[in-house]
């Protein structure tokens, strides 16, 4: 009996859930040979898309199916939760973005203590070769896997020869001379440089959350805001005011928004606030899921001497927001 192995379809991509406890004596999860790559793929940025595109093209030449092998959670969750990076994309977003690449299969490996204990050779033999029927493995320029990630491409290629797996290495993709990576995107977003992050991602950086109740300070000033609750492990941009696109669950229209992230120093608050003033909008959306796509940072967070001074600044921020968003195309809603 297979342990923790199920499948379902997202668009035309088959999802295969895999556990390291799968017995070698069992039938493989994939009958056809696979041309695959492996990684966590947080953000699914331009570099990831190039790698996966190369895998898809190689699979066509090889006469195999194409596959992405990924983990169900970031490895640091198990070993160093205090050092876990804030994620660019949630697991659901990551799988949805993978489905858009045209890859045939996505194998999601349950990351647990057994998986983490496997050497690179054992991972290739037990999971990639035996369970997933991988015949060609295309690795990213910095790809590392196996216990403690101590081995590299030459070792992987040698193990591949033992198992009749052709192991190849892709080249890095750069942007203005800088290598595109998830860690560099996290740094950019953390500094508020959402424009540069978008150039690495190939789309605006975005977050999702649920609209919850707040202190109503914005409404009292003439700038009502929707307070957004986001998952704790999601990456947030640096404090400040941003021009954003707002998508609301159940609504096909995409709205312009002025987003504020910060501690609300003018009101002496001590907790982080994530709220958006949706322009030309006045409806009750409490409890609704929203997606916020960041276009540009308007200004840094600032403490004002009075509420009236803050209101004047918000009026200027709104003018700037409208101007910036008028020069950008709104994202297309999925039908």
Write out the residue ranges for each language-model feature.
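Glycine-rich, highly charged phosphate/nucleotide-binding loops
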Residues: 86-94, 118-124
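Positively charged, low-complexity intrinsically disordered leader regions
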Residues: 2-34
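ATP-dependent adenylation/nucleotidyltransferase module used to activate substrates
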Residues: 98-99
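Classical nucleotidyltransferase
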Residues: 114-224, 301, 305-311
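Phosphate/ribose-recognition catalytic cores of enzymes acting on nucleotide-derived substrates
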Residues: 214-335
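General small-molecule cofactor/ligand-binding pocket signal
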Residues: 14-16, 106-109, 166-170
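N-terminal catalytic cores of NTP/NDP-binding nucleotidyl/phosphoryl-transfer enzymes
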Residues: 25-90
């Amino acid at each position: 009996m297979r342990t923790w192995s199920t499948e379902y379809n997202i668009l035309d991509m088959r999802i295969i859930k895999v556990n390291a406890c799968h017995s070698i004596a069992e039938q493989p999860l994939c009958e056809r040979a696979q041309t695959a790559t492996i990684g966590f793929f947080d953000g699914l940025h331009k570099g990831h898309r190039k790698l996966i595109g190369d895998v898809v093209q190689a699979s066509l030449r090889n006469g195999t199916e194409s596959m992405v092998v990924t983990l169900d959670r970031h490895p640091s969750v198990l070993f160093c939760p205090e050092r876990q990076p804030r994620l660019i994309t949630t697991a659901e977003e990551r799988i949805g973005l993978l489905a858009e690449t045209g890859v045939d299969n996505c194998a999601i490996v349950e990351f647990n203590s057994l998986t983490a204990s496997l050497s690179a050779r054992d991972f290739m033999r037990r999971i990639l070769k035996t369970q997933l029927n991988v015949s060609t493995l295309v690795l990213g320029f910095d790809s590392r896997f196996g216990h403690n990630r101590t081995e590299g491409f030459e070792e992987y290629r040698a193990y591949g020869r033992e198992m009749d797996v052709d192991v190849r290495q892709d080249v890095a993709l750069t942007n203005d001379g800088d290598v595109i990576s998830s860690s560099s995107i996290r740094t950019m977003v953390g500094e508020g440089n959402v424009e540069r992050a978008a150039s690495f991602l190939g789309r605006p950086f975005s977050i999702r959350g649920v609209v919850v109740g707040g202190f109503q300070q914005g409404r009292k000033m003439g700038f009502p805001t929707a307070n957004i609750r986001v998952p704790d492990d999601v990456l947030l941009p640096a404090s400040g005011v941003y021009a954003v696109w707002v998508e609301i669950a159940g609504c096909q229209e995409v709205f312009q928004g002025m987003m504020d992230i910060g501690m609300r120093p003018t009101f002496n608050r001590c907790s982080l606030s994530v709220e958006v003033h949706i322009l030309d909008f006045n409806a009750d959306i409490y409890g609704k899921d929203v997606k916020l796509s960041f276009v540009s940072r308007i200004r840094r967070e600032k403490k004002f001497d009075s509420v009236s001074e803050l209101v004047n600044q918000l009026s200027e921020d709104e003018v700037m927001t409208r101007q910036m968003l008028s020069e950008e195309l709104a994202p297309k809603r999925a039908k």
